[in-house]
Amino acid sequence: MAQRDYVRRSQPAPSRRKKSTSRKKQRNLPAVSPAMVAIAAAVLVTFIGGLYFITHHKKEESETLQSQKVTGNGLPPKPEERWRYIKELESRQPGVRAPTEPSAGGEVKTPEQLTPEQRQLLEQMQADMRQQPTQLVEVPWNEQTPEQRQQTLQRQRQAQQLAEQQRLAQQSRTTEQSWQQQTRTSQAAPVQAQPRQSKPASSQQPYQDLLQTPAHTTAQSKPQQAAPVARAADAPKPTAEKKDERRWMVQCGSFRGAEQAETVRAQLAFEGFDSKITTNNGWNRVVIGPVKGKENADSTLNRLKMAGHTNCIRLAAGG
């Protein structure tokens, strides 16, 4: 019995046609053209030749540069400028020069060579250097505790007392120096008068021996008379050393309202002055003190004026 291929018969006709057409297309595809191959080979050859030429040309340039460097010995040309310090060294004269200052612009001059204005300025600078440095007053600030504020106020008082003591000591020294100068001048006057009077006594000695004794008595009486003058000059010294022991108050305002007095007191406390408010007959007075001695009160007033409180006045503690 003959076998039949049922599978091939079962496949549809279009699928058979598709397979046959695809095989025909694969057979009909053209091969790579020889012209394209030749162009690609030419491009590749030119690229390789260009690379070779570039590398070879660089080597030649490096060889020429090396030859130029060898011929030049590797040194730059000499500068044409002749430096100024060489001329100064050639024309320098031996000897020690006086120091110069860039601000002055010349040699240091002696006091005889200075102008009157320069001398005045020099004397002023020397006087400023002799003065004692000013001590800055420590001002209590708002964030301080009451104990710290009290400590700062105590330090201020101690500093004021020290400054006052130094000032009084300086005054006493000046008075002593002036007193010593006066005593020296008073002692020198009778010593100069004594030889003047001894000359006529010696001239009269060969003629009148009796007149010799009065001359000595007169010469001796004058130094004795000069002694009371010196004692009389000693008298002003204890009066100058006496101090004002009274107590004074410094008033910086009198207000009807308590708020104004508190603001003034706060300003004084901020600037380092210990003040208080006293009420009398409806008036609120801002006072500082009591301060012992008129000089201390005056110094407090001066410091208040420097701080800007010009309306402060000095009052007696009982007034």
Swiss-Prot record:
Pfam family, one: SPOR
Stretch list, region 2 X 4 AA repeats: 197-223
Molecular-function annotations in GO: peptidoglycan binding
Positions of transmembrane segments: 34-54
Resulting phenotype, residue 313 to A: Reduces septal localization by a factor of at least 3
Effect of residue 85 to S/W: Lack of activity
Consequence recorded when altering residue 263 to D: Intermediate localization defects
Keywords of the record: Cell cycle, Cell division, Cell inner membrane, Cell membrane, Disulfide bond, Membrane, Repeat, Septation, Transmembrane, Transmembrane helix
Span list, region Mediates interaction with FtsA: 4-6
The organism of origin for this protein: Escherichia coli (strain K12)
UniProt similarity note: Belongs to the FtsN family.
Official protein name in the record: Cell division protein FtsN
